Swiss-Prot record:
Localization per record: Secreted
Taxonomy of the source species: Eukaryota, Metazoa, Chordata, Craniata, Vertebrata
Functional note: Blocks M2 muscarinic acetylcholine receptors (CHRM2). Fully blocks the binding of N-methylscopolamine (NMS) and oxotremorine-M to M2 receptors, slightly increased NMS binding to M1 receptors.
The protein's name: Muscarinic toxin 2
Family, per entry: Belongs to the three-finger toxin family. Short-chain subfamily. Type B muscarinic toxin sub-subfamily.
Length: 63
C-alpha cells in the first residue's frame, strides 16, 4: 500500500507500507485553539476517545 506520510505543515510525501491500510488523524493544535493538525501514515492505529481517525485501504487514500 502507498500512503501519504506527513503532517499538515509539511510538503506532501508518500511511503510504501507493509500493511494494507492508511490513516489520517486530526487533532487540535495546542498553540492555536482554532487550528488543527493532520497526521498521515501507515496502518490504522488505536487512538484515545475523542481523536478523529479515518482509515482507508486504497493507495494514497489518506490525502
Amino acid at each position: 500500500r502507498i500512503c501519504h506520510s506527513q503532517m499538515s505543515s509539511q510538503p506532501p510525501t508518500t511511503t510504501f507500507c507493509r500493511v494494507n491500510s492508511c490513516y489520517r488523524r486530526t487533532l487540535r493544535d495546542p498553540h492555536d485553539p482554532r487550528g488543527t493538525i493532520i497526521v498521515r501514515g501507515c496502518g490504522c492505529p488505536r487512538m484515545k476517545p475523542g481523536t478523529k481517525l479515518e482509515c482507508c485501504t486504497s493507495d494514497k487514500c489518506n490525502v
